[in-house]
Amino acid sequence: MLGISNLCRYYQGQRRVCANKFYQKYVNHSDLYFFDLWEISANNLWIKLAFVLLLCLFEIISGLEYLGKMAQEILKQGIPANVLQEKANLFKKASANNKIKDEMPNALSLYQNHSFFQKLKHLADKKNLDITSLPGGREVEYKHLDAGHLLADTNVVIDVPLVPQLAARTPTDYNFGTSRDKSATALHVGAIEVVIQSYASSECDLMAGMMLVDTFHSRPENAIRSVYIVPIRGGMFMRALCFPNTLVPMDSDINNRFKVVFSLPNNDFPQGSKLGHVSINMAGCTTSLSKTYVPSPLLTEELGREAATVIQYLGRDTYAMQTSNVPTSDEISRMVFNFHMEGKLSMHKTGSLSSILSKSKSLRYTIGGSKPKNKLADKAHNEEAETSDSKGIIDPKDGNVFANPQTDTDLFKLSLDDTSSPKGSLLDTRFAQKKVLIPKAMAGGADLLSSNLYDVLSGSSFRASLALARTHVVEGKIRCICTINLPENTGCCLAITVNSSNRGQFSTDIYTTGSQDRILWNPACSKNCDFSFNPNPCGTAWSLEFLRRTKFHLSVTCVSGWSAQPQTDIAMTMDWYVSNKPCVPCIYNVGTPGQNVWVNRWMGKLSFPQGSQNQLKQMPLAIGGGAGAKNSILMNMTNAFLSLWRYFHGDLVFEVQKMSSPFIKSTVTFFIGFGGLPFSENLEDFPNKLIQFGEVQERVEITFTRKEFLTAWSTQVDPAGPVAGDGCPYLCAMVHDSTASTITGDFNLGVTLLRIENFVGIGRNPGIQGARLLGSMQAEAQGGVVRTTDGVYSTCFRVRTPLALKDSGSFTCDLIGGGITTDSNTGWNLTALNTPVANLLRTAAWKRGTIHVQVAMFGSTVKRSDWTSTVQLFLRQSMNTSSYDARVWVISKPGAAILEFSFDVEGPNNGFEMWEANWASQTSWFLEFLISNVTQNTLFEVSMKLDSNFCVAGTTLMPPFSVTASPDSRPLLGVKTSTPAKKYVGGSLQAGPSPD
């Protein structure tokens, strides 16, 4: 063993011992004694063990010597210690990359129609299958069926071949195939694999949408079987796999049943060029009259749940979805099943020389919860039933008694209770027409039409007029199409505005009327104007009576007069329709205003005279404080809503409207700056946007994103302070080149802040009195999620008792409407403040949510022992004597006291309530004070704040809010406030009862 065959030594009796059988040939030698090493005995066991241990030690020493020499060689040549291991790992990974193969399961694994030996029998000829000669129950599998090339286009439709093209059979009287009941009549499609080989670059971004469509279905919900999104990159194949589980008849249309529709959204190949090649793999099973397919558990349990998949060779940018349209029990209950079987034609003998052909009775049967669409069948179809059923209907009480109906018409199923809205073409849905006179001497600010919308729409006799008047629920928007045909050498700007309600002698300025829904129109640029709106901003439906009782208002105003005066007065025609577009609510939520806040804030009119002279126009973006007028401010709902926050920021989207003749040309640049900027040429170093209108271009939108503003800014500024010191941004405009034309007139632009995107509001705003003037050189202006501060109240009412009165007194605050009424005593000092909460409650047409109220009562300086005054407070929803109180408080605390409470505004219109509306008998919320001693309780302040659940919708047109000096203003830190408080005295425009 191991080369030691010559190892010999003496042992016992001087005999030579040899340890190898190789020398057994010397067994007859007289001097030697041979024995087998593996022969175990008690005498030689320890010798043999020692010999084996010696051999093992020798091998270990030899191995260590070899490893030492190899380590010295590696160190000598400088080979890193981990190189061999890394190469081994790379070789292991490389050897694991098997060749690409079809991923679709073979047909034998999808079905279990045959035994194992029968499947082996079919393996030999499965590649040469003639499906027309196969019997039923035979598994078939086709690989790499050519589906054609994928062409570079937006949408591409490719046929999915299931089998090779079937050869047309020659008609013959002989049948050499299988018997009729055994031959295949249909093919069950178990799996389809769509293989795409792309010709595009392997590093491109081309994506494709794929949709497997069953063309025998006409409705999309049934036709679409699988949807995929896959990358179309070159290199390895992309494979989309699905399991249709569909039986297809064996006829000439078998290869037209399924189609793959491709959508290539970012294709950059030349139009019509070859983008890739498509091939199809299919596995299925034939069926016949006597034998069907038997799916395997793999197909029914695993692959059926897996549905559509994408074999990923190109990464993970793949998506797949299998559609299903299984009906629910409710859908089945609404279906109507109609059965009809025609009678049999037979010949009957009527005499010895004559006979007739007659048809027996036809069968009709209906299953369903509702009557079929053809509710009254044709008389010809029911003729047999009417003649045969001459005895009438059997009475269910007594089978021997027959009840004869008095009418053949089912009155309950004539659809006389149809509540749907008028629908159809424009001719069918037009319900009113109004002509508005446009005078030839028209100037900016002229009111062309101001009326409640009901008065404009009622009294017409168009097709839909009566239908609209008799419909309780109209779900479509109101659509108005206006037409004027003006020459292009003139021009003007008309504003068509609608608002949910109005009060008193409201302002008709475009700032006030244009905050809800409006459109600005220059008839010289476009000959017609299409305007749609929802008259119920907090709901999805309306009615004509709803418009009448809520005083929904329509205004047509001239914003900018004629560029060139026409020779005669002009008539504008307004046609009114019920739109097929559904009404969509527009609700403003105080707690979660949303990312996009629609403002429709009129920023001002910019006039640039012709010539090369230039000037700077600035429009403040502190837009919460309203617009200033003489001794008053103009306010609308959206600006009051923004003023609830102390600061705000977002992306500002402006609409720039051309209001002069298209023949007057100019290029205007817009940029963001700060107040007090001097005019200089380098102002265009600011990031700016150049506006240049085309011939008939009427308007353009520009956006200044959040990146233009370093921080948020205030929604209100002190109107008495200097413009340069408010620290808020301005929208600036100036002429880039010059203004010129072949006709006279200025280049006029109207600027509107349409919406604020990505809106963020910060903090609550107690409010600032007053606002900067609207118009002039500075074209005007002033304003969630939201970071707010709880506990900030806005003072809305301040009442001081008469100094000469020594008895009891009473007054009432309309918490929603903003008015104050007193008893018959004179000398009351009443002040209603224009705070953000008060402005929003007055200008918002519809309100819903919780309002928190704080009442502060201040008394005169008398001793506690002399205090005798008691104040009773009554919270009511109506001032009628027949109405009950909602809550009552009694306060007799000497000196001063504070009362805090809350109430919920809830109404009939999707939870919203309108102030003092005739619709649904809506009222308001009133807080009535009854003071037993007005000389001791002398001053009352009512403050309010809105809960985060408070919502508003729609605008109420209001008169200008008065701003007058008040000598009775409460001092602040011992000094009179520099900003005068707003004062409403009983009998003034706002203090009296609400106008009708």
Swiss-Prot record:
GO terms for molecular function: DNA binding; GTP binding; RNA binding; structural molecule activity. The record marks K423 as: Interaction with the viral RNA. Keywords: Capsid protein, DNA-binding, GTP-binding, Host cell junction, Host-virus interaction, Inhibition of host innate immune response by virus, Nucleotide-binding, RNA-binding, Suppressor of RNA silencing, T=3 icosahedral capsid protein, Transport, Viral immunoevasion, Viral movement protein, Virion. It comes from the Viruses. Residues 368-398 are annotated as: Disordered. The keyword Transport applies. Residues 375-398 have a biased composition (Basic and acidic residues). Residues 363-369 are annotated as: Involved in tubule formation by the movement protein. Signal peptide: none annotated. One of its GO terms (biological process) is symbiont-mediated suppression of host innate immune response. Pfam families: Como_LCP, Como_SCP. One of its GO terms (cellular component) is T=3 icosahedral viral capsid. The record marks Q406, T407, Q782, G783, L972, L973 as: Cleavage. SUPFAM superfamilies: Positive stranded ssRNA viruses. This is RNA2 polyprotein. The lineage of its organism: Viruses, Riboviria, Orthornavirae, Pisuviricota, Pisoniviricetes.
